[in-house]
Amino acid sequence: MHGDLFGPVMPVTPGGRLFFLLLVDDATRFMWVSLLTTKLATTDAIKRIQAEAEKTCGRKLRVLRIDNDWEFTATEFTDYCANDGITRHYSAPYSPQQNGIVERRNQTVVGMARALLKQRGMPAKFRGEAVVTAVHLLNRSPTKSL
């Protein structure tokens, strides 16, 4: 699984969300997204997404490819991964191309969210909700992996 935290996204959503966490399954390219108010909520969001992903896929999360941002190197997160048997693969600093799968999906999701808002004439404060909608739509679209 590949993960990345995107943000801060301005303007803030009506729910006070500034960031979104995107996790992408390596085999199927299925995505899970969580809107977050702070970076401190990253570990809890990953726990929720992991439970949902394991229930959906019927397999345990074993490897997580992420960047070197502090939210992924914090003690709480490293302890959680160690206790749950998750191996973390970090990309080199300032090398987003090493985590290209999730970085590219971020671009696709943000672009689609922007297009959804523009097409309906909605204000930018609904970008978070548009991101969730974009992930929902992309998960139901065919990919090369399928």
What do these predicted regions represent?
Residues 1-146:
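Anionic group-binding determinants
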